[in-house]
């Protein structure tokens, strides 16, 4: 399995620190608003990476944090007339509502910055003791020039960064590149007691402290959006490696941006749609499929046309699943014939192709193409004309769902638990009864009623199949 490492700018063979186990960290949201579609991309794509690693047999410890103390949260609290804690609590709950609807599994641990204040203070103290940080008037800053590898992730020499840094004549920092580890308390802001007085942590130190606490000094994979590579991840490296004296991360993974009109979708530019807004139009399932149909490192353009393409692709997969379920219920009885057994064994080629493209930097776009190849072959073998057995249909469904589950392809609720599906089945049964009684007018009336509701019927020797138009 190969992963593209931002640090080396090339694909590298994935070798975990501990055989059979993976320690993985993803930077989570700053919880002051609903997540937008751009925020959802790393959440979905690194959920897929975690799923694939587990499918390959790894035991994955996945940590995704919440930044629950920050200038933006404080600003939102002031606007809404509530505490920062209440803002964070509200939007963490909203995050999980959206994430669950997107088919994203919860991380092993979802730590909050405010639950790790002592770990943050301890890490800052270590950096001060080692000469990598200094205190000024209750603020603590990282001494960037002391860490000579600064800029190695973003591939920017420290000299270039220094010459391009903005100089503030009133700056109390030793160097314009220095960044805050601890911020002295201001009136009306949340604070904690520390050796440097009352204050709160800076953003960058939070992730270093939480990663260190829950995953250890060196971890396998750290992932996030491309916009986090500099300065956030660069600063994490400086903090963690200076404090611990060892390599922080073995594989750095960054997803590409989602663009609108060739500009990155972001709250700061105001050109964003929340996941909830997009889901109201296209559905959460469609948003996930939209993400899966592109390689995670490629830029992705957000448009109604592309989302509708994703919706159509998802519907094709759902139709394939319902077709197999139909023949599991209505196909011939009996064991697999010799020819059927050979056919099922032949489907293993698609798992091999799927594994090959996913092993190549978890290429979900190519993986979905492989699944569609499999579907085309299955649809030929499991069709009314082929008169398939229930056993063959079940074997095909098992192999189809195994690959779909790795990507978290959303099929919606089970039709047996879908109230609308039950009503449709009842109407189909009533139509069948009318046909049996040769009441053709009533049978046609029921068919027309279902058609008007967007339900298409197909009469087959095995029974009546239906799908949504």
Model-assigned labels for residue ranges:
Residues 108-111, 222-224, 390:
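Short catalytic-loop micro-motif centered on adjacent basic/acidic residues
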Residues 264, 272-469:
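Structural preference for alpha-helix termini/caps and helix-kink/transition segments
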Residues 8-13, 17-105, 462-466:
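N-terminal, positively charged nucleic-acid-binding surface of large information/translation enzymes
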Residues 58, 132, 455:
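Short phosphate-binding/catalytic loops that engage adenosine nucleotides
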Residues 66-70, 92-95, 105-120, 138-147:
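Short, glycine/charge-rich beta-strand/loop segments that flank catalytic centers
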Residues 1-32, 47, 97, 118-325:
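Alpha-helical recognition segments enriched in aromatics with Gly/Pro capping
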């Amino acid at each position: 399995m190969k992963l593209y490492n931002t640090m080396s700018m090339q694909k590298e063979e994935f070798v975990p620190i501990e055989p059979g186990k993976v320690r993985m960290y993803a930077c989570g949201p700053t919880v002051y608003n609903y997540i937008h579609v751009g925020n959802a991309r790393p959440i979905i794509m690194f959920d897929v990476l975690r799923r694939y690693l587990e499918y390959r047999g790894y035991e994955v410890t996945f940590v995704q944090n919440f930044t629950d103390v920050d200038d933006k949260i404080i600003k939102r609290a002031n606007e809404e007339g509530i505490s920062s804690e209440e803002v964070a609590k509200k939007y963490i709950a909203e995050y999980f509502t959206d994430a669950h609807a997107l088919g994203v599994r919860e991380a092993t641990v979802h730590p909050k910055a405010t639950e790790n204040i002592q770990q943050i203070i301890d890490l800052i103290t270590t950096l001060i003791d080692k000469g990598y940080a200094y205190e000024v008037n209750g603020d603590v800053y990282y001494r960037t020039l002391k860490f000579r590898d600064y800029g190695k992730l973003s591939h920017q020499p420290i000299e270039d960064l220094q010459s391009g840094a903005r100089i503030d004549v009133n700056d109390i920092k030793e160097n314009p590149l220095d960044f805050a580890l601890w911020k002295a308390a201001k009136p009306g802001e949340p604070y904690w007691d520390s050796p440097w007085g009352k204050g709160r942590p800076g953003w960058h130190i939070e992730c270093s402290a939480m990663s260190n606490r829950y995953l250890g000094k060196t971890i396998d994979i750290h992932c996030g959006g491309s916009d986090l590579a500099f300065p956030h991840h660069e600063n994490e490296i400086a903090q963690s490696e200076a404090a611990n004296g060892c390599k922080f991360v073995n594989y750095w993974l960054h997803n590409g941006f989602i663009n609108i009109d060739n500009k990155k979708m972001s709250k700061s530019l105001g050109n964003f749609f929340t996941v909830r807004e997009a889901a109201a139009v296209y559905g959460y399932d469609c948003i996930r499929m939209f993400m899966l149909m592109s390689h995670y490192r490629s830029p992705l353009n957000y448009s109604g046309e592309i989302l509708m393409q994703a919706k159509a692709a998802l519907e094709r997969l759902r139709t394939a699943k319902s077709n197999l379920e139909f023949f599991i219920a209505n196909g011939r009885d009996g064991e697999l014939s010799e020819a059927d057994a050979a056919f099922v064994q032949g489907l293993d080629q698609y798992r091999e192709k799927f594994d090959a493209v996913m092993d190549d930097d978890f290429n979900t776009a190519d993986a979905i193409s492989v699944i569609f190849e499999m579907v085309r072959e299955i649809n030929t073998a499991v069709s009314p004309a082929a008169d398939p057995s229930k056993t063959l249909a079940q074997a095909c469904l098992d192999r189809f769902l195994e690959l779909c589950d790795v990507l978290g392809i959303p099929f919606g609720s089970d039709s047996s638990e879908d109230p609308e599906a039950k009503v449709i089945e009842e109407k189909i049964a009533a139509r069948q009864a009318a046909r049996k009684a040769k009441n053709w007018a009533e049978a046609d009336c029921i068919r027309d009623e279902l058609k008007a509701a967007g339900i298409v019927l197909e009469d087959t020797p095995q029974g009546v199949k239906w799908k949504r138009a």
